[in-house]
């Protein structure tokens, strides 16, 4: 989920809307369709098929992704996320004059404004665009490609703590809901709850580790006597690469959620994490979309590991391995092994 372009300067609005946003919808719908097809294979007994991919994809777009995206986009607009076809707006910075240092003992001098651009006033061009509509499906579809190069750290893409919360909830919504969908379709709700509980346990353990590591601060700075204790004047901890409006906790929570769901959205700089914090993020990425994972891909990724676990457990106790009434044989294990090893081999 590497974003190697600055959308606000590289892409036109029509490209963002008709190219990238459409692909965000189709990507998420494809994952949901594949997951639903796999669940049907577990649920059905005598049926000859497991459904039509195109029908499932259209249903996922029209009945799930589009309605949720509209609601989320409106909520984000209410928080200050921009939604306009205007390319940019010009603004005059607050600091038009700057002070310059002079030799010791002399008075401080004030320079005149820089080279005039508009009536002698410095002007800043602020990029705008249809941001809220793209951010909504970026988060709901666990895609990650932001309208701006700074992604969800940009103040026009994620301006407030509440918009940050909405974006995190959007990331977790579909992967969590699909666990309950699985339990409902196979006729055993506890099966879906079991998958959700397994995902949540791993997520919470790593979340606690990153919280502790980032709030403890950078040990190299501690040796230099830098004050990294939380107080009324600072959030404390390792604030390098993090937005002040979010602080440690909101940044870390977003970090863990976005890496768990295999989403490329970020609201802080992951390269600036402490060693333990970065280790947890890398571990979530390298799990291969198992802990919640992307829209649809997290569910079928976890089911692949469930099949393997059931097979090993069956061999250990001397019983024929079965999962939801379906026997797990050599062919199923070969296919599960290919699915597990595919991503590491490609990487």
What do these predicted ranges mean?
Residues 1-347:
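Membrane-proximal intracellular helices of multi-pass ion channels
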């Amino acid at each position: 989920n590497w974003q190697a372009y600055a959308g606000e300067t590289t892409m036109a609005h029509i490209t963002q809307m008709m190219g990238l946003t459409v692909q965000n919808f189709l990507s998420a719908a494809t994952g949901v369709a594949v997951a639903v097809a796999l669940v049907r294979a577990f649920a059905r007994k005598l049926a000859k098929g497991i459904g039509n991919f195109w029908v499932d994809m259209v249903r996922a777009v029209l009945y799930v992704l589009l309605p949720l995206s509209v609601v989320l986009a409106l909520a984000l607009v209410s928080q200050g996320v921009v939604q306009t076809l205007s390319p940019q707006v010009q603004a005059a910075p607050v600091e038009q004059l700057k002070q310059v240092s002079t030799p010791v003992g002399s008075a401080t001098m004030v320079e005149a404004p820089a080279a005039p651009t508009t009536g002698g006033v410095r002007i800043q061009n602020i990029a705008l665009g249809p941001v809220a509509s793209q951010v909504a499906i970026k988060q709901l579809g666990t895609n990650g490609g932001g309208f701006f190069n700074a992604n969800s750290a940009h103040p026009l893409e994620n301006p407030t703590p509440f918009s940050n919360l909405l974006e995190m909830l959007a990331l977790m919504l579909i992967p969590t809901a699909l666990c309950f969908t699985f339990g409902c379709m196979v006729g055993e709700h506890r099966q879906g709850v079991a998958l959700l509980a397994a995902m949540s346990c791993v997520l919470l353990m790593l979340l606690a580790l990153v919280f502790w590591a980032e709030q403890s601060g950078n040990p190299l700075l501690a040796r230099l006597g830098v004050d990294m204790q939380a107080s009324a004047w600072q959030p404390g901890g390792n604030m390098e690469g993090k937005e002040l409006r979010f602080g440690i906790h909101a940044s870390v929570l977003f970090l863990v959620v976005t890496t768990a769901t295999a989403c490329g959205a970020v609201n802080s700089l992951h390269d600036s994490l402490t060693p333990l914090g970065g280790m947890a993020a890398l571990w979530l990425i390298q799990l291969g979309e198992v802990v919640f994972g992307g829209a649809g891909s997290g569910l079928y990724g976890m089911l692949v590991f469930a099949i393997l676990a059931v097979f090993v457990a069956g061999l250990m106790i001397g019983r024929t391995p079965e999962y939801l009434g379906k026997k797990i044989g050599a062919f199923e294990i070969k296919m599960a092994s290919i699915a597990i090893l595919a991503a590491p081999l490609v990487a």
